[in-house]
A protein has these predicted regions:
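Active-site pocket-lining/capping segments in soluble small-molecule metabolic enzymes
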Residues: 8-59, 96, 100-161, 179, ...
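Extended, intrinsically disordered, low-complexity segments
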Residues: 18, 23-32, 179, 197-281, ...
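Active-site glycine-rich loop that binds ribose-phosphate moieties when present
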Residues: 59-75
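Conserved, mostly hydrophobic/aromatic
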Residues: 72, 76, 109, 173
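Catalytic beta/alpha-barrel core
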Residues: 78-87, 176
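Charge-patterned, long linear interaction tracts outside catalytic cores
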Residues: 163-188
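Metallocofactor- and cofactor-centric catalytic cores in central/energy metabolism, strongly enriched
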Residues: 277-403
């Protein structure tokens, strides 16, 4: 890094990036040269891949990974690739979850030729999202004592993984590892293909779970995906609702619901403030003070509290993601601050689960934060239909702000429906 580490830039999260590329493939609509006009760019032809990290120990983290995977598919992902891991039951769960939701998206399995050295790094949490259990590390350490430092057994393990992925109906595999030669890839693919008829024999020796690990689905006797997989959410208990969240839900219904009387009144209030900059600044300062004290508000002007169960993603998520967590958390802790900061999305999950709204985490799409609204009133932008939540229809409250930019000409493109063929 030049004179220190550069600041992270999170203008788009992974779901938003997939959504953008999908729109590019359709022909992206952009502002035209003349004010008030648009132009459509020539369609691109990207094959869109998206990742999922199923090797999570807790319910919250695992289900959030599956939910975000679903969001990526709805946003336009053409295939899914897994993070590397060594628990075949978790690999299979990726396909079982997609089947339970009616998706037939191809899934690529990750085959990493794991050495003892790389295993030690991953076992200690040195590669976020990559899990190597103590049991597997002990095996790798013993294998490293062989004359070839365990290479033959590593290649054999990789070939067995190829065979199992083929048997479980995966669309393909990604083979990786350090210092592999062309001959090694040939050996893995050829041997794995030859062993494919015996793939079930290899499952037990490729199943390295974690202590007290949560699984979304019961064990499969056949290790195959059924066309009638049950939605795992239906098996989850709701849990208790935090009092603070219950109060915010009540407040939202009274003040922020689009058809409420208070909403109409607030629209008129902020419309009037538009004509008085000094009063608007005072009002904005008071709003920011309240929201900063209660939620850690960063004054982005395009508030996502409604979308994230009143846990501000700008303040609480290290990557400011609005559509779910990254894949780097472990045991509920943030990848960036693993010893001091809990993953913001764990609490968001618990809150929405307590109110029976988990579908918001897998079906809802939150557009990118509108940077042009930074340091402006988030409440004003909401009530005057300037932020990402603005509906496509004309202002139903009759409190038109008089600003042509207050209401977008059309809503963001809806996420596509599940693939069924």
């Amino acid at each position: 890094a030049y004179r220190g580490q550069a600041r992270g830039v999170y203008d788009l999260d992974s779901v938003q990036a997939v959504h953008l590329i999908h729109e590019m493939n359709q022909g992206l609509e952009v502002p035209g040269r003349k004010p008030g006009t648009t132009a459509t760019l020539p369609p691109t032809d990207f094959c869109i891949g998206a990742a999922v990290s199923p090797f999570k120990q807790t319910e919250e983290e695992l289900m959030l990974q599956y939910f975000k995977m679903e969001k990526k598919v709805r946003a336009g992902a053409d295939f899914i690739i897994t993070q590397l891991g060594y628990d075949m039951r978790k690999f299979l769960e990726v396909r079982r979850y997609l089947a339970s939701r009616g998706f037939k998206t191809p899934v690529i399995g990750n085959v990493y030729v794991l050495s003892a050295g790389a295993g030690r790094v991953m076992n200690s949490g040195g590669v976020p999202g990559c899990v190597v259990s103590d049991e597997l590390l002990a095996i790798l350490t013993e294998e490293a004592k062989d004359p070839d430092k365990g290479k033959a057994k590593r290649l054999e393990r990789a070939a067995k993984m190829v065979a199992v992925f083929k048997g479980m109906g995966f669309a393909g595999v990604h083979i990786g590892g350090f210092a592999l030669k062309t001959a090694d890839f040939v050996t893995i693919i050829k041997t794995g293909t030859e062993w494919a008829p015996r793939w079930r024999d290899f499952v037990p020796e490729l199943s390295f779970g974690q202590p007290d690990e949560f699984y979304a689905f019961p064990p499969s006797e056949t290790f195959e995906v059924s066309e009638n997989e049950d939605d795992p959410v239906l098996r989850l208990a709701k849990g208790s609702k935090p009092l603070s969240y219950a109060l915010m839900e009540k407040l939202h219904g009274v003040v922020f619901e689009r058809d409420s009387l208070v909403h109409k009144m607030m629209g008129g209030y902020y419309k009037a403030l538009d004509k008085h900059p000094t009063l608007a600044a005072v009002s904005h300062g008071g709003e920011f003070g309240i929201k900063h004290l209660m939620f850690g508000c960063r004054d982005c002007g395009d508030c996502a509290l409604f979308d994230t169960a009143y846990r501000c993603p700008m303040a609480r998520c290290a990557k400011q993601s609005r559509n779910g967590p990254c894949g780097g958390s472990a045991t509920g802790m943030c990848e960036k601050c693993p010893t001091s900061k809990a993953c913001a999305w764990v609490e968001i999950y618990r809150r929405l689960k307590s109110s029976g709204q988990l579908d918001l985490l897998r079906e809802g799409y939150v557009p990118p934060c509108r940077r042009e609204l930074a340091d402006t009133s988030g409440w004003g932008n909401y009530f005057l239909y300037r932020d990402h939540s603005a509906p496509a229809d004309p202002d139903p409250t009759g409190t038109d702000s008089g600003d042509d930019d207050a209401k977008p000409a059309k809503k963001a493109v809806a996420a596509k429906e599940p693939k069924t063929s």
